[in-house]
């Protein structure tokens, strides 16, 4: 009985990707950028706690509903064949129940925020639910993922400043483009499998132009973040962080130049450092 309970618990951990925090970190860094920018420094501590915990919960919820949506495909993809659903370790109804629990806890936290933030949270839930199914219908599902991974930015401004200034939407746009860039690197890992299954991705859509388009998206991200710095009157630490991020983008281009699966995955993982460096630049600016 203990062994069965342990295996079930491990399956839930895998469903929620608690053992793979990269997605949580990629969602967390821009959320923290937005909180600090909206507050002109250290944000309200309760708001900070709600968003950090909320990021963890909603990223996990997104992974859970993604596995439910892909339950008939994951067993045919090398990278995902060992997930709990295709392995038969959990039932589809259990996956939906776990998603509901995670989403409800997240919503309970949001209810402690102001009405504007609560209203925006419904769009966040809709995006989280819709994204996994977009791989069947639109040629660039990463656009929806980018919106989902960026929606915490206007929510952060709403919670901290009770307003949605233009700069909030610039940060949103920068993060949207960055997300498409790094998730295209991720999609390059699965491109051959996705083609066989008839699934869609930006890596398939961009084809042989993938590296150039990723580079263009990365450049646009940096240019928009430069504008954010000007509008927010940020100091030199922020611009040094953007320069460091640019160097990492160049490094990622070197990694993906041969389109090898492992190298593309390493380029994707490297984006964690991009987000962390920009956050460090923002925080140091306000010290």
UniProtKB/Swiss-Prot annotation:
Q: Where are the transmembrane segments?
A: 21-39, 95-115, 116-136, 138-158, 161-181, 213-233, 234-251, 264-284
Its cofactor is:
Mg(2+)
Q: State which pathway it belongs to.
A: Cofactor biosynthesis; ubiquinone biosynthesis
Q: Which GO terms describe its cellular component?
A: plasma membrane
Q: Where in the cell is it found?
A: Cell inner membrane
Spell out the InterPro entries in the cross-references: HB_polyprenyltransferase-like, Prenyltransferase, UbiA_prenyltransferase, UbiA_prenylTrfase_CS, UbiA_sf
Which class of enzymes does this protein belong to?
Answer: transferase
Q: Which Gene3D superfamilies match?
A: UbiA prenyltransferase
Q: EC number(s) on record? A: 2.5.1.39
Would the keyword Transmembrane helix be found if you checked this record's keyword annotation? yes
Please report the record's description of how this protein sits within the membrane: Multi-pass membrane protein
Q: Please provide the record's keywords in A-Z order.
A: Cell inner membrane, Cell membrane, Magnesium, Membrane, Transferase, Transmembrane, Transmembrane helix, Ubiquinone biosynthesis
* The keyword Magnesium belongs to this UniProt entry's keyword annotation: yes
Output the PROSITE patterns linked to this UniProt entry. Answer: UBIA
Gene Ontology molecular function terms on file: 4-hydroxybenzoate polyprenyltransferase activity
Gene Ontology BP, a term: ubiquinone biosynthetic process
Pfam families, from UniProt? UbiA (PF01040)
Highest taxon, organism lineage: Bacteria
Describe the reaction catalysed, as an equation.
all-trans-octaprenyl diphosphate + 4-hydroxybenzoate = 4-hydroxy-3-(all-trans-octaprenyl)benzoate + diphosphate
Which family does the record claim for this protein? Belongs to the UbiA prenyltransferase family.
Q: Which HAMAP family match?
A: UbiA (MF_01635)
What does this protein do, in the record's words? Catalyzes the prenylation of para-hydroxybenzoate (PHB) with an all-trans polyprenyl group. Mediates the second step in the final reaction sequence of ubiquinone-8 (UQ-8) biosynthesis, which is the condensation of the polyisoprenoid side chain with PHB, generating the first membrane-bound Q intermediate 3-octaprenyl-4-hydroxybenzoate.
Q: What is this protein called?
A: 4-hydroxybenzoate octaprenyltransferase
Organism this protein belongs to: Aeromonas hydrophila subsp. hydrophila (strain ATCC 7966 / DSM 30187 / BCRC 13018 / CCUG 14551 / JCM 1027 / KCTC 2358 / NCIMB 9240 / NCTC 8049)
The record lists the lineage as: Bacteria, Pseudomonadati, Pseudomonadota, Gammaproteobacteria, Aeromonadales
The gene behind this protein is ubiA
């Amino acid at each position: 009985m203990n062994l069965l309970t342990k295996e079930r618990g491990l399956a839930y951990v895998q469903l929620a990707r608690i053992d793979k925090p990269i997605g949580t970190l990629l969602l967390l860094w821009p959320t923290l950028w937005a909180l600090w920018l909206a507050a002109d420094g250290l944000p309200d501590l309760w708001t900070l706690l709600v968003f950090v915990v909320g990021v963890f919960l909603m990223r996990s919820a997104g992974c859970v509903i993604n596995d439910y949506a892909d339950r008939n495909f994951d067993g045919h993809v090398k990278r995902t064949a060992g997930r709990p659903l295709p392995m038969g370790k959990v039932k589809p109804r259990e996956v939906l129940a776990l998603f509901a629990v995670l989403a409800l806890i997240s919503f309970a936290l949001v209810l402690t925020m102001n009405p504007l933030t609560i209203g925006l949270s419904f769009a966040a839930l809709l995006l989280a639910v819709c994204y996994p199914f977009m791989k069947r219908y639109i040629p660039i599902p990463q656009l929806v993922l980018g919106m989902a991974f960026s929606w915490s930015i206007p929510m952060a401004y709403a919670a901290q400043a009770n307003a949605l200034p233009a700069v909030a939407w610039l940060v949103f746009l920068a993060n949207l483009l960055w997300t498409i860039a790094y998730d295209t690197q991720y999609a390059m890992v699965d491109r051959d499998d996705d083609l066989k299954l008839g699934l869609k991705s930006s890596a398939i859509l961009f084809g042989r132009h993938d590296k150039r388009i990723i580079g263009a998206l990365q450049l646009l991200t940096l240019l928009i973040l430069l504008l954010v710095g000007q509008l927010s009157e940020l100091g030199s630490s922020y611009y040094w962080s953007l320069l460091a991020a640019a160097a990492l983008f160049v490094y990622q281009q070197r990694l993906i130049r041969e389109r090898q699966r492992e190298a593309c995955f390493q380029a994707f993982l490297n984006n964690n450092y991009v987000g962390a460096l920009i956050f460090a630049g923002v925080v140091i600016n306000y010290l």
